[in-house]
Swiss-Prot record:
Homotrimer. Heterotrimer with TRAF2. Interacts with TNFRSF1A/TNFR1, TNFRSF1B/TNFR2, TNFRSF4, TNFRSF5/CD40, TNFRSF8/CD30, TNFRSF9/CD137, TNFRSF11A/RANK, TNFRSF13C, TNFRSF18/AITR, TNFRSF17/BCMA, TNFRSF19/TROY, TNFRSF19L/RELT, XEDAR, EDAR, Epstein-Barr virus BNFL1/LMP-1, TANK/ITRAF, TRAIP and RIPK2. Interacts with BIRC2 and BIRC3 N-terminus; a single BIRC2 or BIRC3 molecule interacts with a heterotrimer formed by TRAF1 and TRAF2. Interacts with NFATC2IP, TRAFD1 and with HIVEP3. Interacts with MAP3K14. Interacts with GPS2. Residues 1-24 are annotated as: Disordered. Residues 182-264 form a coiled coil. This is TNF receptor-associated factor 1. GO terms for biological process: apoptotic process; positive regulation of NF-kappaB transcription factor activity; protein-containing complex assembly; regulation of canonical NF-kappaB signal transduction; regulation of extrinsic apoptotic signaling pathway; tumor necrosis factor-mediated signaling pathway. The coiled coil domain mediates homo- and hetero-oligomerization. Residues 266-412 form the MATH domain. Changing residue 185 to R: Nearly abolished ubiquitination. Changing residue 193 to R: Nearly abolished ubiquitination. SMART domains: MATH. It comes from Homo sapiens (Human).
């Protein structure tokens, strides 16, 4: 192109007059103050009416040259354009290669593995973002999908805006066809990426639905398990209460059986007392003041009685004598018996050498409340507070206590 004439500087082209890759001053010295791009080589060409071909390309038949060949023609006609370099088609996923169109084509062939790795990393990043949405729940996942669709639309709109910004002001049909081809290619790539993302989101949605179903099932089963556990715990408490009641009843039954085995039904009762030394010490210390014997009866359906022994004495015999009393107990057949109780009572401390038993007897005081029909479990004990001196209990002449054991006998007169 001819060098610029005149002293007025050539203004920069309008921003819509240069396509991408068209340097602003490839062809110098335009004849007009305004310039546009050569339809053949994308180089700057002076605006001179209908002449849209720069002098370097005017010798070529541009109508018969394909877009790819036209680029090679541009490289030959304007090597400075090729030296400027173009980016790799995979720059959007991280490839930083730039060069001439031929070197870019060779780069695409030789760098397929690295491009696949870049695409893989790109997809992993999107998958991670989608995974975050999955962990946050379906609402967050739908929001991520909307964001992706919006971002893809923005990218498409941005690319279209850039293309429009860089669209050549030439009205050449070939250039318009090339631009349309590039736009369609970019749109196809973005649509392909969007379809991939939509497929990924669809799969993740299915997984989310399956997870929600499994979670709902698990929650329902957990609720059933909790209700079952509560029911079993309540049942265990009931069984424990029942078991405690049965243990108590069994204890009473065993005690009753033992008492029945030890009881007599003829008015005569023999009471064996073991650990006499320890029991005397406990009585003297006030720890165990008195001892009760098992119950016995004057007959099978007669009076129910028991003995009460104070090893350290009671009343007038405290600390000096054994005090022995009889206790009228409430029986099952009291309503059929004559009251007050009037049978003679005889106490005996047995000499285990059978030499000299200690004996004391008395007849009931019919006016005493101790011998009236019992209104509680037991009446007040009555008997002999000075039954036997403590000083003679360990006498070597007698065996009232032998092997730390002594025997007391009670005889209730049954004939009236």
């Amino acid at each position: 192109m001819a060098s610029s004439s005149g002293s007025s500087p050539r203004p920069a082209p309008d921003e819509n007059e240069f396509p991408f890759g068209c340097p602003p001053t490839v062809c110098q010295d335009p004849k007009e103050p305004r310039a546009l791009c050569c339809a053949g080589c994308l180089s700057e060409n002076p605006r001179n009416g209908e002449d849209q071909i720069c002098p370097k390309c005017r010798g070529e038949d541009l109508q018969s040259i394909s877009p790819g060949s036209r680029l090679r023609t541009q490289e030959k006609a304007h090597p400075e354009v090729a030296e400027a370099g173009i980016g790799c088609p995979f720059a959007g996923v991280g490839c930083s290669f730039k060069g001439s169109p031929q070197s870019v084509q060779e780069h695409e062939v030789t760098s397929q593995t690295s491009h696949l790795n870049l695409l893989l990393g790109f997809m992993k990043q999107w998958k991670a973002r989608l995974g975050c949405g999955l962990e946050s729940g379906p609402m967050a996942l739908e929001q991520n999908l909307s964001d992706l669709q919006l971002q893809a639309a923005v990218e498409v709109a941005g690319d279209l805006e850039v293309d429009c910004y860089r669209a050549p002001c030439s009205e050449s049909q070939e250039e318009l066809a090339l631009q349309h081809f590039m736009k369609e290619k970019l749109l196809a790539e973005l649509e392909g990426k969007l379809r991939v993302f939509e497929n990924i989101v669809a799969v993740l949605n299915k997984e989310v639905e399956a997870s929600h179903l499994a979670l709902a099932t698990s929650i329902h089963q957990s609720q059933l398990d909790r209700e079952r556990i509560l029911s079993l715990e309540q049942r265990v408490v009931e069984l424990q209460q029942t078991l405690a009641q049965k243990d108590q009843a069994l204890g009473k039954l065993e005690q009753s059986l033992r008492l029945m085995e030890e009881a007599s039904f003829d008015g005569t009762f023999l009471w064996k007392i073991t650990n006499v030394t320890r029991r005397c010490h406990e009585s003297a210390c006030g720890r165990t003041v008195s001892l009760f014997s098992p119950a016995f009866y004057t007959a099978k359906y007669g009076y129910k009685l028991c003995l009460r022994l104070y090893l350290n004495g009671d009343g007038t015999g405290k600390r000096t004598h054994l005090s022995l009393f009889i206790v009228i107990m409430r029986g099952e057949y009291d309503a059929l018996l004559p009251w007050p109780f009037r049978n003679k009572v005889t106490f005996m401390l047995l000499d285990q050498n059978n030499r000299e038993h200690a004996i004391d007897a008395f007849r009931p005081d019919l006016s005493s409340a101790s011998f009236q029909r019992p209104q509680s479990e037991t009446n007040v004990a009555s008997g002999c507070p000075l039954f036997f001196p403590l000083s003679k209990l360990q006498s070597p002449k007698h065996a009232y206590v032998k092997d730390d054991t002594m025997f007391l006998k009670c005889i209730v007169e049954t004939s009236t």
